[in-house]
Amino acid sequence: MPNVIGVQFQKAGKLEYYTPNDIQVDIDDWVVVGSKRGIEIGIVKNPLMDIAEEDVVLPLKNIIRIADDKDIDKFNCNERDAENALILCKDIVREQGLDMRLVNCEYTLDKSKVIFNFTADDRIDFRKLVKILAQHLKTRIELRQIGVRDEAKLLGGIGPCGRSLCCSTFLGDFEPVSIKMAKDQNLSLNPTKISGACGRLMCCLKYENDYYEEVRAQLPDIGEAIETPDGNGKVVALNILDISMQVKLEGHEQPLEYKLEEIETMH
């Protein structure tokens, strides 16, 4: 079980793990590391910790150093240059008539590479675009096609709830979300009601799903005949949050509500 440090390269981004290399770091320290993209600067989110080997990609790389003022200045300068590179790329994309939507642009710390993230409905032949960009920017060019959920994460925004998007605020990874989760929570299945800014099912459908599944497994099915303190009847509705059910009793016009524990005492 290796000792590692969790480093994040963007807000709410996925953690990448590095060995400390005998360097003492604290949470929120800026560090210089070698990533799969090149030399980058990131922020420490998890200090020294033990982690199972199956949860990391081996072999682990070392932290190079704690970022100094020169590194921070270079990082900030790179961000300004990335804004200009993004404008340039958008102009070239427009001139070339490419059907792609540029999302953002990032330089590695040593400027050995510039990465453009984009979305597109189909595969794009961007070989000519790469050639033109390389002539202008004098560095290696990487064009990376991402999905709409990643686009929302990078750009940020406001969700239907009126709060900042979860994916751009605190969600490191996207977990699978299904329409069944909305059904289990008795939510409207209208796509406009359960879709996020990205157009996909809202990530928050997952948050309470485990609770709903746990409680639902304890409650009887709708239509099931059960025995209550007031006689026999059929379940006509369930209230997951209240852990209760409405039961239509024989000889009663209106259903009565019972807590789960009231029914359990009958058995």
Residue ranges and their predicted role:
Residues 161-228, 236:
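Conserved glycine-centered short motifs in functionally critical loops
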Residues 16-17, 252-264:
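A short macromolecule-binding patch
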Residues 237-239, 262-267:
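Secretory/periplasmic and organellar redox-cofactor proteins
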Residues 1-191, 267:
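Acidic-enriched and Gly/Ser
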Residues 48-52, 238-243:
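Short, conserved beta-turn/loop elements at beta-strand boundaries and strand-helix junctions
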Residues 239-257:
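Basic/aromatic-rich interaction segments and small domains that mediate binding to polyanionic partners
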Residues 1-3, 25-27, 219-222, 239-243:
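A short, compositionally biased
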